[in-house]
């Protein structure tokens, strides 16, 4: 049976400042930790990325032509405040005014994120969000943006609080590159959630027009053997690390007893303790019913198996299928069923996981109000032939995920839009320019854009709301 989506559904494309803009030191932009980190540790940098800083009119014209009526954009904090605080950079402010004006001219609604992995270097080297002073700096930055950019109708505080902490302190593939420090992961998540809550409360108290929410990456976690209580426990603990801890903070304004039992177990086994203060919970509680929407980024699910051994994580950065490894002491290890498809980067393709995650939010956090799927897409080694990419695998991936969104809506979930990652090809944080996701192919040498087969397919779905 052919499935459909509502008439007012947003068919969007997603970007992020650092992954798309290039121009990393142009017009007064301050440095971010990624600048030197990529130079020192990877085979690529954020120059030129997709040169969105100069070519956004081209990308927004393409968006309009291909039925994309929403775009996720992030503001680079260090374009506004080069050191994260203090003096404002007027050229950075002007750039985003021009960008948002172009969005509205092209009838592409901007959904604007304040922080997408790119804390200014001056604050990052001072502890980033492990340093509580950063909460104040973020709230001040947020307030400036709310006042300055009144043309923005949809605000997101953070993109993917979970993967920020994981990347920085667990997997160690984001600066500062620390591995296996679970206490830092949870503390970073907590402090960012307090920052989020304070910014949301400020937005509502300030009477600013528009809506505000947060974007969480929510990979669904399943037990490898649902009949084995140890596997069930492993999945629950892994879910706490990646999903439940931040969802509780967002919508309960506290951590449930079950969540804290899991956190305490993980820290008992791995060492470290948390600094959770009374005023933090006052802030979380004050914001728990003020979120206008939840953004869910969903790419994959994981299966967890009980495991008794030391932590070891191997990140598959170059698309060498089967080279990744993930096992955490006192938690479990990832072990997927053999019949579940994976990408070359070992990301598990499982659309049902998106349905299950949406329905979990609906059941466990009934004050969620509404959901946007703010990222979903297929990373692929695209082949450019005949001035296009015949990306049938991407079409199949997106189609199956749109179908389960349609199912979730039919089953009572309030899902209002979908943003494909990514609008045009961008560079990937820890995979470089080989892992591509865009609707529009980017020749990174000439910066020419070419619509892929998926762009024509997406246009038809956006125009008809029929998934076929």
From Swiss-Prot:
Keywords: Glycosidase, Hydrolase. GO terms for molecular function: 6-phospho-beta-galactosidase activity; beta-glucosidase activity. GO terms for biological process: lactose catabolic process via tagatose-6-phosphate. It catalyses: a 6-phospho-beta-D-galactoside + H2O = D-galactose 6-phosphate + an alcohol. It comes from Streptococcus pyogenes serotype M4 (strain MGAS10750). It is an enzyme of class 3 (hydrolase). GO terms for cellular component: cytosol. Belongs to the glycosyl hydrolase 1 family. The gene is lacG. Pathway: Carbohydrate metabolism; lactose degradation; D-galactose 6-phosphate and beta-D-glucose from lactose 6-phosphate: step 1/1. InterPro entries: 6P-beta-galactosidase, Glyco_hydro_1, Glyco_hydro_1_AS, Glyco_hydro_1_N_CS, Glycoside_hydrolase_SF. Its EC number is 3.2.1.85. This is 6-phospho-beta-galactosidase. D-galactose 6-phosphate binds at residues 19, 116, 159-160, 297, 428-429, 435, 437. Coiled coil: none annotated. The active site is at residues 160, 375.
